[in-house]
Amino acid sequence: MFINYSSIIEICVQWPELPKKDGDILYVHPNNLGDLANSIDDIHVRFVLVSCESDHPIPYGLFEESKKILYSDNVICWFSQNAMRTFSKLRHLPIGIDYHTIKTKTKDEQEQVLIDAKNSNTIKKNKIYGNFHFQMDIMFKHDREEALSQIPSDLIDYEESRIPRGECYKKMASYKFIASPFGNGMECHRTWEALALGCIPIVKTSCMDSLYEGLPVLIVNSWSDVSQELLDSYVYNCPNAHRLYVEYWINEIHKVAKSGLQVLKEDIDKALNTSYTFNNDDVCSEFSDEEVNLLATE
């Protein structure tokens, strides 16, 4: 099955239940990370933490709570969606495919719709498909505004109105490229939908770049870099296709849980030394302690 965070949550002990033995995997929604930080000293086993289902930028959206969690010797490793600073103890977890919004169909049924759409279009237009413009009032709206204004109009076809998901998947699958600016967080379901459909998502460079290593994701420094020459020269290559599937990520989490990884406090301090903020020029730029505190309140 393609990566989706609901399947990851299913393998976890779920907060407020606490891990009971070494190597347990604990899921905590980011809204409850403060409660976990306050209770961390009461947990006496070593566990792996998983957080997702939220657009909180980790660790800087909840900086003090995140530091306390990362400093705990009982936290083996933390896998997080929208992780803006990664190292051995804090690792990316993809947002993946949205199988949780539609409650009337199972994950398997929704995945089959995706697979059928992929198989319905084996010849793809050498153009970009865009449907991100229907939702602009979001945290990273500047990235979508820049994509709208800077991608040459002759290279992209925008959907005129919202269409059902299955129809949307078929439309996406008929294009070689999918424009995927940031969502309300720095990740977007659209990126992973595009990959599952055999398309090439185009994203702007960010703290998420390492998450896409070995996947056919076209990363640009600026949306103004998108050109016909760039599209023509990009070669589809997917040596890390296994990273598209939830089984890979579950295995990675279990592997780390069994490893008993130990990370020194000074290594954590070093990893957190550079902070990130969001601005129109560089989504991963340094910022002051005052700005860290401001971001932590958003």
Model-derived features: positions:
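Nucleotide-sugar donor-binding catalytic core of glycosyltransferases
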Residues: 1-192, 196, 200-219, 225-295
